[in-house]
A protein has these predicted regions:
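Acidic helix N-cap motif at the loop->helix transition within catalytic regions
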Residues: 44-52
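A short, conserved alpha-helix in the catalytic core of glycosyltransferases
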Residues: 162-213
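Short, acidic, metal-binding catalytic loop of nucleotide-sugar glycosyltransferases
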Residues: 23-32
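Cell-envelope/extracellular polymer assembly enzymes that use nucleotide-activated donors
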Residues: 3-6, 34, 194
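Conserved donor NDP-sugar-binding/catalytic core segment of glycosyltransferases
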Residues: 92-129, 135-137
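Non-catalytic, C-terminal membrane-associated alpha-helical segments of glycosyltransferases
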Residues: 228-236, 247-308
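Short aromatic/hydrophobic "clamp" motif used to bind/position activated sugar donors
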Residues: 84
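Glycine-rich, basic loop-to-helix element that forms the pyrophosphate-binding segment
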Residues: 21, 61-79, 89-91
Length: 308
C-alpha cells in the first residue's frame, strides 16, 4: 500500500493564493494524500468558503497568528500521514511532485527530509532553490544553490544537501517523533534552518530532489522588504547562531555582526528613508540582548566542519 502523505499548508490573509494552491493539487498523480489547511487568524474568516469549495480539506482556524512554525506545528499535530509535506500556500505543485519527493526515502532510510527544485512562479525558468550551501559560521547565512539562475540543467543532479527549503519540504514522520516539531520561538524565518540542524544532530540526512519541481510566488504573505521581515530576519539570524554554534564561534560571529551587519543595516534603511524598517532592525537586535535563555548549543557536524 502506498504511504499516506499529509500535505500541510499555512494560510494568512491570502485566501485567493491558498485556493490557487488547492486547485493545483487536483492534478497530483499520487492519490494517497490528505490536505490539512491551517489558517493563522486571517482577518477574513475563510472557513465557509474552504468547506464549501474544498470539502476534502481538513481545515483548522487558529484564534491567533502563531507564526510560520507555530501554525505549521498545528497542522503537523493533526497529520495522519507517514510523510508530512510542509508547503507554502503561495506555491503551485507539479503533477508528479509527491511521487518524486517520496523516491529518495525508499533509497536511503537515513534520509529524513526532502525538498524539490523550487522555481519562481512569475519566471518559471528561474531557480530559487536547488539545495543549500553550508551555513557560513562567521556570517550566519546559508546560500540557496542556483538562486536566480536560469535553469539550463546545471542543477539537475539530486543529492544530499545542508538544508531543506521551508517553502516545500517533505519530512518523514519518524523524524518528527524523534526530534519534535518546528521550533516556534522563531515565529518567522530561520525556523526550518534551526530544525534542520536538530534533524542532522539526530542522525538524519537532508536531500535535494532535482526531479521534483514546484513554483513559488515568493513573499506574497509578508512582502520582499516588509518591516516584519526586517525584524524577524535580523532577530532570528542571531538567535540561530546562539542555538547552533559554540561560544567561541558565536564570539567571532558577534564581531562580524558589530563591524559589518549592523553598520550596513543602519545605513541601508537610513538611505532608503525607511524609519519603520530601521526601528524593526534595531528591535530585532535588541531582542537578543534581553532574551537570555537561548544559549548557544552544540554545533552540528556540518557547522563543525565549516569551522576547520
Amino acid at each position: 500500500m502506498k504511504p499516506l502523505v499529509s500535505i500541510v499548508i499555512l494560510s494568512y490573509n491570502q485566501l485567493k493564493v491558498s485556493c490557487e494552491f488547492l486547485d493545483s493539487c487536483r492534478a497530483l498523480s499520487y492519490d494517497n494524500y490528505e490536505i490539512i489547511m491551517v489558517d493563522n487568524a486571517s482577518a477574513e474568516d475563510p472557513t465557509q468558503l474552504i468547506k464549501t469549495n474544498y470539502p476534502y480539506v481538513r481545515f483548522i482556524r487558529n484564534e491567533q497568528n502563531l507564526g510560520f512554525a507555530g501554525g505549521n506545528n498545528i497542522g503537523i499535530a493533526a497529520a495522519k500521514g507517514d510523510y508530512i509535506f510542509i508547503v507554502n500556500n503561495d506555491t503551485e505543485v507539479t503533477p508528479d511532485l509527491l511521487d518524486k519527493l517520496l523516491e529518495p526515502f525508499q533509497k536511503d532510510p537515513a534520509i529524513g527530509v526532502v525538498s524539490p527544485k523550487i522555481k519562481y512562479f512569475s519566471n518559471p525558468t528561474l531557480i530559487q532553490y536547488a539545495g543549500y550551501t553550508a551555513m557560513n559560521p562567521f556570517t550566519g547565512q546559508a546560500v540557496a544553490i542556483g538562486h536566480k539562475q536560469e535553469d539550463q540543467g546545471q542543477h539537475d543532479k539530486s543529492g544530499y544537501t545542508n538544508f531543506a527549503h521551508g517553502a516545500a519540504m517533505m519530512v518523514k514522520k519518524e523524524v518528527i517523533e524523534k526530534v519534535g516539531a518546528m521550533p516556534d520561538i522563531f515565529f518567522l524565518y530561520y525556523e526550518e534552518l534551526d530544525w534542520a540542524e536538530q534533524i542532522k544532530r539526530a542522525g538524519f540526512k537532508i536531500y535535494y530532489q532535482a526531479e521534483g519541481e514546484i513554483f513559488h510566488k515568493e513573499s506574497v504573505s509578508v512582502g520582499k522588504e516588509s518591516p516584519l521581515k526586517a525584524y524577524y530576519h535580523t532577530r532570528n539570524r542571531v538567535l540561530f547562531m546562539r542555538r547552533n554554534t559554540s561560544p567561541f564561534q558565536f564570539t567571532l560571529f558577534s564581531l562580524f555582526l558589530v563591524t559589518c551587519v549592523i553598520p550596513k543595516g543602519l545605513l541601508k534603511y537610513i538611505l532608503k528613508r525607511q524609519p519603520i524598517h530601521l526601528k524593526n532592525f534595531i528591535r530585532g537586535l535588541w531582542w537578543n540582548v534581553g532574551y537570555r535563555t537561548a544559549k548557544p548549543g552544540h554545533p552540528s557536524p556540518s557547522m563543525q566542519a565549516a569551522l576547520r
